[in-house]
Amino acid sequence: MKKTPRSTARELALLALSQLPKKSGSLEKKQLQEVVLAAVRTLRIEAQDILETAAAELQRGSDRLLNSQIDTTDIESARVMLYEAIELGQTAINRIGTAVELPEMLQLTNQLEVRSYAMEVLTKVNGNRKEVDKLLQESIVDWQIERLPRIDLDILRIAVAEMMFIGIQKQVAISEAVELAKRYSGEDGYKFINGVLRRVFDKINVI
């Protein structure tokens, strides 16, 4: 799926948030800019790591295929090795599919529009964290936000800040948060994040 500048900015802001202190505090613009630059470097490293891992998996798959022809004396062993080789190949292809998106994303991070919006998101989240976290705590059922994985909490904070302080349409903010969760959160994290933000949506509409 083709990334928009704002989708890229949100991802950049998410990576940058992970490098900010857990407690909110006053941060100068220069400090935030340095955090954004560090997030860009993280993306570059991620792209390199994905490709290196995919290459290693393809090599292991190739070795399995070769061994299935040379080292096995029965059909069942050969079948197992062949299956493992196919599985490694499929995993590598999936990784490469992810890596293919990263060059475009890295190119987008150089755009002023992308970095400016990432900075705006960071500024709003950091400057209004108490209010954002209060609303999130009220919207999470039988759980404390301090116990959430940091990545999930930061995705939620971005969406709430966009809805409350940047003026992004609520459905758009929720949809974008779900996409971030599918990429960065645990297996079912996106479902949890979607549910919490739906409740946030209802509370904001009442305010």
Curated annotation (Swiss-Prot):
SUPFAM superfamilies xrefs: NusB-like
GO cellular component term, pick one: cytosol
Pfam families xrefs: NusB
Biological-process GO terms, alphabetical: DNA-templated transcription termination; transcription antitermination
NCBIfam families hit by this protein: nusB
Family classification: Belongs to the NusB family.
PANTHER family: ANTITERMINATION NUSB DOMAIN-CONTAINING PROTEIN, N UTILIZATION SUBSTANCE PROTEIN B-RELATED
Protein name: Transcription antitermination protein NusB
Species in which this protein is naturally found: Trichodesmium erythraeum (strain IMS101)
The gene coding this protein: nusB
